[in-house]
Amino acid sequence: MNPTARVEKMRRTMEEDGLDGLILTQPENIRYFSGSSRGGLALIPVEASPILYVYRLDYQMALDEAVGFRVKYGRNPLKKMLRDMAGMKLRKVGFDQLTLSAYNVLNKALKRVKVVDYNRKVHGLRAVKDEEEVSYIREACRIASKGMEAAYETLKPGVRECEVAAAACRAMRMEGSEEDAFPMIVASGVRSAYPHGGCTRRRIGRGELVVVDLGATYMGYRSDMTRTFVAGEASDRQVEVWEAVLEAYSKALENVRDGVPAREVDLTARHVLERRGFGRFFIHSLGHGVGLSVHEHPVLSRYSREKLVKGNVVTCEPAVYIHGFGGVRLENTVLVSDGRAEELTVFPMDLL
């Protein structure tokens, strides 16, 4: 589906909801609908050509990249957009995300226009990937798997966490990653019990758990994967925790398919960990959508009301975090289909 087709699909949804226009401020949303990576703001009217508003330094790049959008530049893209909107017959306009100050400026400038939150509808459209998007994510996952291989080969007692991260980052760049999908995590020892432990200059100790969470970017699309290793020989306790998380992952993955409520997938993993005595140490949801953003819809949470559908790309990442002991997380990016989900990140899940 090209950007123009996405705009038309969005417009049909807007018409059903009585919207005359849609304001986009988030870079990922602007790229999804326009094809440009350099958008500041975008306006999609139902009955006029969509417009991309940028600063002067981004104008030429936006002009070259944008598909089906007029491109305008100025010192203040928001004011320029508001001037254009004042000349349109708009009664109800949606937005994806606005700061409070921008929302106040919008309401003051367009007093007769009703402004409504339309973020969920925008993300609902983005949640189902077309073949081109899947191909980009698949490549980002291939690159991430190479990064994990480099991390594994570098990781040993005495090596600093940041050195492991550097090796993985270099490998992914050499394979064609545009940037890390998110700040990489290499958390060792007791730090592995921090879900977002980042990476430090800490030297990895012998026999310690090491959580490595990384992702690559290709054509703007992200990947996300986590492995947990032991620097040396694993203890019985470490193996016990790791096997529990692996079973939770495997059981949950069996449930990742078209039509299954997202909460059921989360609860499948949660029940495994509860049965094994680790339920209270699983402190986040099971997964999230992946695309132009590394965290998007659908959300695999016990509180979710969403259903998985064919074309969703999600993570499956059960974990156990025990303060003072360490953590184990296993994660793949997977593609939802009619049958068993396809794992797009493929590096082995071996503990050692």
What is the role of each PLM region?
Residues M1-L352:
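Active-site neighborhoods and metal-handling regions in enzymes and metal-associated proteins
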